Amino acid sequence: MKTVSIFGSTGAIGQMIIDVILASSDSYQVKALVAKSNVQLLAFQAKIVNAEMVVIADVGLYKELKDLLFGTNVKISVGDVGMQMAASLNVDYVMMAIVGIAALVPMVYLISAGVKVIALANKESVVCGGTLLFNLAREKNVNVIPVDSEHNAIFQILHSNDRENIDKITITGSGGALLYMDYDQMRNITVQETIKHPVWKMGKKISVDSATMVNKSLEIIEAYHLFSVKPEKLDVIIHPEAIVHGIVSYVDGACIAFMSVPDMKISIMYTLSWPNRMSMLYKKLNLASYHQLTFMKPDINKFPGIRLGFEILRTSNIHANSIIFNTANEIAVDAFLNRKIGFLDIVNVIYSTLDMVDCLHINSLSDILECDSIARRVASDIICKLN
């Protein structure tokens, strides 16, 4: 039986991880569940998977969580101390599903503790942690395996094939909820229309990122770090059916594509069984049911957010600009979800923040967090002026 801890268990991806574990309950023992503030769901999850330990990040919710778990043997911890305790547990797999840059510090704790495998469903920690994070992972001999479908696809292709003669790595994108909408129509698009993804079941933040196509820029930067590939070897193509998740092209003209139904549970299953595979628990791909598969170049005029990743990788300060980009996007998306700005304002806020913030040296975790703090303040000020 394999042991696993889940950071961010109450989020959209975290709940899918719980579903996969429950479907293979004889194969996994859950050591720890970590959540931000959803005590009701955290307590419920702890009971159904028989977790040994739970951590709630919000220290003010300790008593409520304690009451909910009264009569069980579940250990309860809170805040940063609890996060460090969970990170220090000896487990076979850690599933990192915390949303946003909030995952970065726990990632550092986990890698520093020398965990065996981190299945990473968080692109922001890679974008902001950059080379510092991966240098530490190499030093501690920690395997970081991406859960996001696109990077998981590329990881699986490269794991089984030649890594030396790559011509291009292509990340696919469904195009999000607004792919076929006219630019002018986007000015008055509602939050509900934006987060109604046509293919994937995702949380609100990533659904907005998909609609702006900023997620593809984040994924380009993520791929740059995950696969140690030169920026000019990275590409994006729009594929609305979301059947092909990634393509690796070689110098001899051969292309290897990874295909599956669009279900995050498939990549979750892979990371929970790596380097092996488990039997399929869900719907399998039936190509005959698809009359066609569509591929198209992204419209960078309609979706300027897709340019950001490539532009940042061409700058002299990739790490700092990646942090500023990610932070500005987090602030702008939150403002949009709270109806403080319009949809088209999101990318404008990002570009304005990049123009106004300059973090010169990123040499430590504290430098990353300081740069994030500055960008957070500037992006918030820009949004206030828009109102």
UniProtKB/Swiss-Prot annotation:
A Pfam cross-reference name: DXPR_C
Residues annotated to bind NADPH: 10-11, 13, 38, 122, 124, 203
GO biological process: isopentenyl diphosphate biosynthetic process, methylerythritol 4-phosphate pathway involved in terpenoid biosynthetic process
Annotated keywords: Isoprene biosynthesis, Manganese, Metal-binding, NADP, Oxidoreductase
Annotated InterPro entries: DXP_reductoisomerase, DXP_reductoisomerase_C, DXP_reductoisomerase_N, DXPR_C, DXPR_C_sf, NAD(P)-bd_dom_sf
List of residues binding 1-deoxy-D-xylulose 5-phosphate: 123, 149-150, 174, 197, 210, 215-216, 219
Enzyme Commission identifier(s): 1.1.1.267
Cofactor(s) of this protein: Mg(2+); Mn(2+)
Binding residues for Mn(2+): 148, 150, 219
NCBIfam families: Dxr
Protein name from the UniProt record: 1-deoxy-D-xylulose 5-phosphate reductoisomerase
Name of encoding gene: dxr
